[in-house]
Amino acid sequence: MRDRGRTARTRWFVLAACLWAGGPGVAFSQTLEITPSQVLVDESAVIRARGLNPNERISIQAELVDGGDQRWSSQAEFIADGQGAVDTSQQAPVKGSYNEASAMGLIWSMRPEDKHVASYQPPRGLGVQTISLHLVRNGQPVASAQLEQLGVAEGVEQIKLEGQLHGTLLLPNVKAPYPGVLVIGGSEGGMPIRKAAWLASRGYAALALAYFRYDDLPRLLEGIPLEYFGSALAWMMQRPEILPERIAVMGTSRGGELALQLGSMYPQIKAVVAYVPANVRNPACCGSTHVPYAWTWQGQPLAFATPWARGRNEAMELRAAIPVENTHGPILVISGQDDGVWESTRMANAVVNRLKTSHFYYSYEHLKYPHAGHRAGRPEIVPTWHGAVRNPTSGREENLGGNAQGDAQSSLDAISKVLEFLRISLGDSGSEK
């Protein structure tokens, strides 16, 4: 697959310091190298230190300022190998903010300097995240380098929708037509632009669709007509850049619930990706809603289960179960086994069990990750530490569950598997032509 997100040539930002070491008459130049120095936010870079003494103990520090103007930092200590080198993709730190060999461990293990910061905020407007790294020897920085993470590949086109649909279509910078993905968010509302940018960077025409808490759309997730999403699918199928018979839907949390529901209703959808989903329709959310139901069809409310925080009601769950077996294509569900918002692994298992019982014609898979929470599988390599996060719709604080290492490992594993699922389900993306 040709990688359009990586610059044509590999650039190394290296600041080298020449110091005397290892004995009289022997000069070493300490360098810190990042290869490549510019990556898409779902890609790894290799961080290497060279010019050290064999078996020398050194540290590497990393720092960034996020989209909320908050400083994050990490550090790890390593023992140089017999050639006087350290490679973070091959060597585990002996001490530091993470404890396993990980090319991007210094990035995902960062923590905020302000203890009141709840979570990492990405750069505004799909901007570039700059990360500064420093090689420290005997307490003194001797070399530095920078890593740039791109929120979207160069040349991706953004087309803002007008009229009754609210969203942005992102098109790859390769020859059309492309498979399409309808991308929907969860209870946070707004437009899921970052996930759509990821897909467009990987060769898919991605429509980031808002359905509440955006412009003049409803303020809360309540009484949302599912015909709205049918209109979005019809719009996508009419676009000359999109292959109409190769469209998937992708959603997260309440959006994962919605993705499964839409897949069961619209035969135009040929694949479903649901991150931390529910297997049942849940009630309206999140605040003082006017009606108890989240979704309508042909003007009528769809049955919903009791709120997950109030315990389970099996009779209501039976009526509200999403008929995933009616989907006209493969299904991929992703869950965190330590999800603090709701039991996404149990509910994703219920999806798989229903497909198995109904002898579902198409393939299906459940990626479940231990020690990952409600952000399991997120397609970006960023600082994963978080505290209690405030839901922008309800204003309530939520415990997302998981830990930094578990969430990071889920992302590192799921990124390639989701792209492979889409490739198999929809055919080659635009980046693979």
Where are these regions (language model features)?
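Cap/lid segment of the alpha/beta-hydrolase catalytic domain
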Residues: 164-165, 176-238, 245, 283-287, ...
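Short beta-strand/loop motif that positions the catalytic acidic residue
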Residues: 327, 333-335, 339
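Short, aromatic- and glycine-rich surface loops/edge beta-strands on solvent-exposed regions
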Residues: 100, 105, 114-138
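N-terminal cap/lid segment of alpha/beta-hydrolase-fold proteins
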Residues: 33-40, 45-57, 69-74, 79-81, ...
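Short beta-strand-to-loop junctions in surface cap/lid or active-site-entrance loops
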Residues: 166-177, 185-187, 320-324, 424
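Acidic catalytic loop of the alpha/beta-hydrolase fold
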Residues: 338-342, 373-375
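Primarily recognizes the serine-hydrolase "nucleophile elbow" in alpha/beta-hydrolase
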Residues: 189-194, 230-317, 342-346
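C-terminal catalytic histidine-bearing segment of alpha/beta-hydrolase fold enzymes
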Residues: 349, 357-433
